[in-house]
Amino acid sequence: MSLAEINKNEVDIVIGALNADLTQFLTSWRPFFSGFHLIVVKDPELKEELNIPEGFDVDVYSKTDMEKVVGASNSTMFSGYSCRYFGYLVSKKKYIVSIDDDCVPAKDPKGFLVDAVTQHVINLENPATPLFFNTLYDPYCEGADFVRGYPFSLRSGVPCAASCGLWLNLADLDAPTQALKTEKRNTAYVDAVMTVPAKAMLPISGINIAFNRELVGPALVPALRLAGEGKVRWETLEDVWCGMCLKHISDHLGYGVKTGLPYVWRNERGDAVESLRKKWEGMKLMEKSVPFFDSLKLPETALKVEDCVIELAKAVKEQLGSDDPAFTQAADAMVKWVQLWNSVNSSA
């Protein structure tokens, strides 16, 4: 699939703006964002006016806009990096591509800039293969195919719900690892896309992700978070939890999730030691979350994404709520998210 074959009217690019001056960011992405509709969501705590260069088809949402859409009491859900979720909420397009404002286009091993938007759409348009692992990675990629022994009955694949891209430079590490390995950088460009196997868990990150909003939009849920989380961080509990919810719901509904290409280049940001001081509680919560998701089975009656999120929230409150109040708050946030999703989209 080439850029000429992509229906740009089906794609929204969502950018959570934590920096007021987006000139350098958008200029670097102009060759790949041109012609697409952009949703820029301003961090509600950012006081400065946004600086956006001309030549983009863009809608900007501020704290005032959030309050008009979801109410003042609910706008607190969208602080810091969580502001990107507001973009997911108000979009009306089939596909969402989310890229953080501290990222620029990466270069492939040949020195060419990577068109992350096109690669994400290619990943989403082609089926996923979560039920039988293809050792040649994505069999739908150019130059690849199904390996020896791959069942013909499974070669049609399943719909792809999400494309989880990667990034170079600032490595995708948690705070303890980054604090110990302060000079560690990701320089490995792996030219591959693969489907995450069914029943396997993974974190996601809005730093570089795309998803089919029509298939799984409500599953991208801002829920489990720590006090003060959402600004500059290595380990963001909300992203990790969201990924586990998205993957479990995708497995339940028969969808697939891909990871690998495209890469972006992530600039330096944050302090790992400071992040560790704030977020070590989150690591303990994750140790409780993994066995929960491992044993969780959603009811067969949950046929819609919204139903799955509600059932998941119910299980979280019943099975994890007594362990930590953060889980109870997460369950309540998941229910609230579905209510907001239904309200905003029913009024469209």
Curated annotation (Swiss-Prot):
UniProt motif DXD motif: location: 100-102
Subcellular location: Cytoplasm, Cytosol; Golgi apparatus
Primary localisation category: cytoplasm
Processing after translation: Reversibly glycosylated in vitro by UDP-glucose, UDP-xylose and UDP-galactose, but not UDP-mannose.
Cofactor entry: Mn(2+); Mg(2+)
GO biological process, one term: plant-type cell wall organization or biogenesis
GO cellular component terms, A-Z: cytosol; Golgi apparatus; plasmodesma; plastid
Role of this protein: Probable UDP-L-arabinose mutase involved in the biosynthesis of cell wall non-cellulosic polysaccharides.
UniProt free text on domains: The conserved DXD motif is involved in enzyme activity.
Official protein name in the record: Probable UDP-arabinopyranose mutase 5
